[in-house]
Amino acid sequence: MDQLSMKKMAAQAALQYVKPDSIIGVGSGSTVNCFIEVLGTIKETIKGAVAASKASEELLLRQGIEVFSANDVSGLDIYVDGADEINPQKMMIKGGGAALTREKIVAALAKKFICIVDSSKQVDVLGSTFALPIEVIPMARSQVARKLVALGGSPEYRENVVTDNGNVILDVYNFKIMNPIEMEKELNNVAGVVTNGIFALRSADIVIVGTPEGTKIIG
């Protein structure tokens, strides 16, 4: 079974957590695109969605799903998003699509975080296969990069990428993240960092994994 089929399988399984008349938090990325597609099949049963990126907002509108601002809601029942890596404790690295800050904002509104992935995203230690994205204020890029080197990382500027918030991304290689919660806090305290792609303080509640053998739910 190919990767896209596994992503579609996980996306389809996430529909079981969608409650009638609710507003759904929606992340961004290729697996979320699959979820938006299947969400369109039940659009008459929900009020709408809050999107974590402009790209997801456009896809939702194309499906005929009303999009609300995060400022329009006081809370969300569920937030559905993918991950670039996820460990057994349901902590993640996210931000391959540069939407990490808005993803954290929308995730923080939700009672339940549902992560949908294919099996290639499962790792024992975060940072094993994927660089850690960090959103940085442009004027602080070099300063933050020096700090990341001092912490043992190898930052690379993601060229020609500007986030929806007008900032830049540094991708940090060679971080083996043994204590994700502490690392998330430490990096967020660096002057000039908007946020980093570790989702440990707000980890997933339910993980739906598309595998060659079928869908696996970790709750």
Curated annotation (Swiss-Prot):
Entry EC number(s): 5.3.1.6
Domain of life: Bacteria
CDD domains (UniProt xref): RPI_A (cd01398)
Gene3D superfamilies according to UniProt: 3.30.70.260, 3.40.50.1360
Active site location: 103
UniProt GO cellular component terms: cytosol
InterPro entries reported in the protein's UniProt record: NagB/RpiA_transferase-like, Ribose5P_isomerase_typA_subgr, Ribose5P_isomerase_type_A
SUPFAM superfamilies per UniProt: D-ribose-5-phosphate isomerase (RpiA), lid domain, NagB/RpiA/CoA transferase-like
EC category: isomerase
GO biological process, one term: pentose-phosphate shunt, non-oxidative branch
Keyword Ligase among record annotations: no
Pathway connected to this protein: Carbohydrate degradation; pentose phosphate pathway; D-ribose 5-phosphate from D-ribulose 5-phosphate (non-oxidative stage): step 1/1
This protein's record includes keyword Isomerase: yes
Catalysed reaction, written as an equation: aldehydo-D-ribose 5-phosphate = D-ribulose 5-phosphate
GO MF annotations in UniProt: ribose-5-phosphate isomerase activity
Keyword annotations: Isomerase
NCBIfam families noted in UniProt: PRK00702.1, rpiA
Subunit structure: Homodimer.
Function: Catalyzes the reversible conversion of ribose-5-phosphate to ribulose 5-phosphate.
Family as reported in the entry's similarity comment: Belongs to the ribose 5-phosphate isomerase family.
The protein, known as: Ribose-5-phosphate isomerase A
Organism: Histophilus somni (strain 2336) (Haemophilus somnus)
